[in-house]
Swiss-Prot record:
Top enzyme class: hydrolase
Role description: Required for accurate and efficient protein synthesis under certain stress conditions. May act as a fidelity factor of the translation reaction, by catalyzing a one-codon backward translocation of tRNAs on improperly translocated ribosomes. Back-translocation proceeds from a post-translocation (POST) complex to a pre-translocation (PRE) complex, thus giving elongation factor G a second chance to translocate the tRNAs correctly. Binds to ribosomes in a GTP-dependent manner.
InterPro entries documented for this protein: EF-4, EFG_III/V, EFG_V-like, EFTu-like_2, G_TR_CS, LepA_C_sf, LepA_CTD, LepA_IV
Record field: catalytic activity: GTP + H2O = GDP + phosphate + H(+)
PROSITE patterns: G_TR_1, G_TR_2
Main subcellular localisation: membrane
Range of residues in the leader sequence: none
Classification via NCBIfam families: lepA, small_GTP
Domain tr-type G: start-end pairs: 5-187
Protein's recorded name: Elongation factor 4
GO MF annotation terms: GTP binding; GTPase activity; guanosine tetraphosphate binding; ribosome binding; translation elongation factor activity
Organism in which the protein naturally occurs: Hahella chejuensis (strain KCTC 2396)
Amino acid sequence: MSKLNHIRNFSIIAHIDHGKSTLADRFIQYCGGLSDREMSEQVLDSMDIERERGITIKAQSVTLYYDAKDGSRYQLNFIDTPGHVDFSYEVSRSLAACEGALLVVDAAQGVEAQSVANCYTAIEMGLEVIPILNKMDLPQAEPARVRHEIEEIIGIDAAGAVEASAKAGMGIQESLEQIVQLVPPPEGDPDAPLQALIIDSWFDNYLGVVSLVRVKNGTLNKGDKILIKSTKTQELVTSIGVFTPKRTETGCLKAGEVGYVIAGIKDIHGAPVGDTITLAKTPDVASLPGFKRVQPQVYAGVFPVSSDDYEDFRDALDKLTLNDASLFFEPETSDALGFGFRCGFLGMLHMEIIQERLEREYDLDLITTAPTVVYEVLTKKNEVIKVDNPSRLPDPGFIEEMREPIVEANILVPQAYLGNVISLCVEKRGVQKNMQFLGNQVALSYELPMGEVVLDFFDRLKSVSRGYASLDYHFVRFQAANLVRLDILINGDKVDALALIVHRDNAASRGRLLTEKMKELIPRQMFDVAIQAAIGGQIVSRTTVKALRKNVLAKCYGGDVSRKKKLLQKQKEGKKRMKQVGSVEIPQDAFLAVLKVDK
């Protein structure tokens, strides 16, 4: 009986809050991975941010040993996956290392769009998908309806789905039995030349780069010289083992296993995710198919508050990119904010989390400008250029047409909220493509401009549907649109960090809202501050922050009116002079106001 038959690699697919991390905790407890004393809630969510927000961001892995009912001992390698739409690339990375996936569905809420998308990814990759109904301890659980939904919406047989409750600890053994029986064992040859796929890497201050790998063929031992295919560098393996969630050294990893490798790599880019590791003596081994590089969808300028932090900021970004392959950055300068970086993110949540991680883990103070998506511009010379920063948009005279990215959004919503969701999509300039009634739910398919989706669509969708609607979207194409750049001028000077690209129909109303909002946020000065929104040379709205002024008439009791006029005139001239030389400090909140302008 070969060792491979007793290995099962699986991951869990679930929507946010359907109980994925809690189920993982129960598996670890059942298999004795941690003693009760070390057990904490959501053991695998190791980042503080993950625990606070109750979401999983990074893929983690755990190796458990399970004594099955058939008397054999199985090695279960479980790779955790995130559930939020912004992190779907993490999911595809985790799935590439598995042969099976558990689809965890909340028995009260039913199937959500996110799980559907990830489930299709798993089925396309040829994984065995096992449905599990979680939260069966809730009084409002409806297993029959949810089973029907899984069959209707996803199309996999759910008759034998395990009924479990991770919180109450029921159905855990049944789930583990299903994994052993239904998930196929990995294929591979422990004696062939080594081929291992890097699923994830992160930087440890003491150990250098730690990589999570899945060995496809061959065996990797401590003390081996390895070759990293894309960088062609050779390294010596100093430590090798598995996570039981604690790091446990085993000295070797064989075909089919998942574990970590430390090879004293100090260069942050030494072990790129999706790369292949092989032994230095067999450099000709074919590279394994990696992952598709994810394209950032949202760009924003990120600047350190004090320019002394610029170098630390760059190092911090370097370390984060190692651990988060989808983060993209390049240096940028702004007149208003000095030196910083233009960063690309997968979505607004990703952007918030990166900013929070930078501020927490690296102790930086940052200012973020309004996020924009990438636009395509066709110039009069017939060149196509991509613009991810409104201040780099060419002069309108050179532009033949502008194209905005369009996404196809799939929305699942209960029938009661259908009207609200449709009117939200129409407000966001959406075009309905399809609509299907599935039991109590409705599946809507819309084409929407990405610029409208990434900003606040997700939050608005949740609020108009009381949290029941779920969303999944992917980029389809660029489409010509009537877009303009909206500039914000303060005392006649353009502030590059506040520029936006908007649709011409919304430009005037957006400009008005913005200037009103800025008026509240810019503190009063000793002179009037004019805040204007302009499209090209045309001013579409204006507000004024009134000057603070001393009461110069206080000393005139009674007295002649001409005396009062003279004093007021003198004050006016003083203010006028001051305005020519004065500069206005723009507070951090003002840059964020651009994001939070409600329609």
